[in-house]
Amino acid sequence: MTGAEYELYYWPEIQGRGEFVRLLLEEAGANYVDVARLPRNRGGGVQAILRALRGELGPHLPFAPPVLRAGDVVVAQTALILHFLGPRLDLVPADPVLRLWVHQLQLTITDLVAEVHDTHHPISVDWYYEQQKREARARARGFTADRVPRFLGYFERVIDRAGGPWALGATFSYLDLSLFQVVEGLRYAFPRTMESLAPRIRRLGALAEAVRHRPRIAAYLASPRRLPFNTEGIFRHYPELEAPARSPKRVAR
């Protein structure tokens, strides 16, 4: 145990799926430690993650990071970790129906993130990107032309239906943090696609900018705790995976 109220176990050199959890913890001002980023002599490094995956944190075996420990509770899977933390850190409404709605939307983000990953690893996670480049080009073509407009258009309609400025209308929640991360990641990975789509997802873009300027998030983004995007994480920028600029399909209304 590190003495922190929350211990996050995730790969120390990438944002990845763990970044959704980091953003929530940062926004809440939570007492947490990113365990694998500690020195090895303090229990950090990749070995910390391997200990978690061996079940040394509790009675249940996680499949993969991120893993969160809060006292005697150990939770894995990004969406479930957020579902667990949201009520504890006052980042989700008390209404159980709204909590389910937020969880549903977060699971939709999980689907999107999986599709982002498959643009650079469409065949096998065990192969290098260079071994599946041709297939990645085909996968990314369909993703940028069809799937990005579909997902982001859906979230645009969610915000519009709620009346904005947040996904739940006037109520800020951890879902808004996750939407920010999605927009940031897609802007990094597929900048031309996002630029051409921007006029049709104005509410989502405004939400992302509002999250960026929240005091704790702004401080986090300016700190070394916020790892940069790179070609090891979920959102990767390979210029060859983005076709020359053209208008994506119209956002469904």
What are these regions (language model features)?
Residues 2-139, 167, 238, 245-253:
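GST-like domain detector, emphasizing the conserved glutathione-binding G-site
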Residues 7-9, 194-195, 219:
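Short, contiguous strand/loop micro-motifs
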Residues 203-253:
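Long hydrophobic alpha-helical segments typical of transmembrane helices together
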Residues 97, 104-213, 253:
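GST-like fold's C-terminal all-alpha helical module
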Residues 21, 76, 92-93, 113, ...:
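Generic, ordered loop/turn and secondary-structure boundary motif
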